[in-house]
């Protein structure tokens, strides 16, 4: 782990390679798992206030569950996460003509109907952020459904943090991303000395 301000960064951010390969996985991270996508409190408000522009892109079962229980529920760690439909898929998922999962929130954003792109936890995936007492732990989430993305990342030689430049900058700012580049350079220089 590398300490940067109030963040503990996994070395995997700099050592692992990753590029989402939706052609291979079909967006499985949006439909598999044991809980919905983590939400920040302000994101709950945004989703609740934006439902009218998001609903036209949602599946009926997603709309039904949100009308019954709301846009989120509390997971086993007592953290807010997106609501799920019966099969475990995120309530905001819809499927395109290739049967790949798509996000109704992101669709509303791409069509100019919403300023909010999607929850930051979704945007940052495969990185997960865990709030600790005095730190945020920033870790690469190893999940077999992303093995094709790791393979593609290796083929294209794209490190996890570089693949995630946009969401990292969205969450922590441009200066933070610049610091990641500096850390990466230091790690590479140390590896050359070995």
Per-range role (PLM):
Residues 1-194:
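Short loop/turn segments that flank or connect secondary-structure elements
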